[in-house]
Amino acid sequence: RKWGGAAVFWQVDCSGRVHTGKIMLYDATTGKRVKHPQPHVCWVHTEMRQKDYNLRLCFFGEHLLPLYPDRKVFVVESEKTAAIASHFMPDVLWIATGGKNGCFNERTISALTGRDVVLIPDLGATQEWQARLPMLGKVCRSASVNDVLEAMATDEQRSQGLDIADFLLMEDTPQMILQKMIDRNPALQTLIDELDLQIVEEP
């Protein structure tokens, strides 16, 4: 277990080919990246010591594109953000570039051919991502940048470079509230399992 329990975000393309895995360590309490005293980011192919490995990045979540050909695609920067946002808004596809400048080239964006795509950049990166629209417009059915975060963010939030996942997690979902209750009283999980209880959300 790398660094005592890091997460691996696998990059799998539309054809099901595994390109690599990005290994990152997160703080179990805050959910934030551990960046001190070192970045705590590395790659599976590096850890496996594969010689002459030719890394060709693809979007995180790209393997879902052919499974849901009619769904709108939301593109974010962080792999973690894509995973979290998919919990809150499962009716669209969430994929990640893996970095502010990652995966924005003609080869990788070909995976988005014919799709309706919405870019949701981190705070402070909106202008840079808007500059990607002409390139995306050549292959996507439609491409736009959603700047709702910039419109609603405070100066402090902008200085922190928050992303959509940070805003989504500011309010607990019923599932999150239940998990906190289970953490405080693990016997509750046994009761839920034995009675086959389900969360019922109000319409």
Task: List each model region and its residues.
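Phosphate-handling DNA/RNA-contact segment within nucleic-acid enzymes
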Residues: 2-113
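TOPRIM fold recognition
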Residues: 31, 70-71, 80-203
